[in-house]
Amino acid sequence: MKHQLPVGLGLFMLTVAALPAFAQEADARAGVTVAQNTCSACHAIRKGQQSANTNAPPFDKIASVPGMTPIALQASLQTSHRSMPNLILSTEDRRNVIAYILSLQTK
């Protein structure tokens, strides 16, 4: 019980620290260019496409995950995955790719 407060406080601080990255307007058009150059070898980046790598979900499927948010994508892009290389994107590129993925959400 006494460890819950530090853990909760730490998660809160990480969330707050991520917010400035989203405070500036992201550019989905720039994001599709970054995605084409960085992600398309494995992921389908446009709606209706099939991913070249069957383990890499298409971006429109990622966008359609219930509750998908910029912070969730930010965490995902900064966390290593077993079958995905560790990407090194600038803050601006990451923000733009996230904006592009979220632009694929059906409303």
What is the meaning of each model-derived region?
Residues 8-18:
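Bacterial N-terminal signal peptides
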Residues 42, 67-70:
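Structural motif corresponding to alpha-helix initiation and N-cap regions
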Residues 19-23:
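Sec/Tat signal peptide C-region and signal peptidase I cleavage site
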Residues 29, 67, 88-92:
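Soluble non-cytosolic domains of exported or imported proteins
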Residues 25-56, 79-83, 103-107:
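Periplasmic/extracellular electron-transfer cofactor-ligation site
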Residues 54-62, 74-104:
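Axial heme c-ligation environment in periplasmic c-type cytochrome domains
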Residues 1-9:
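Bacterial N-terminal signal peptides that target proteins for export
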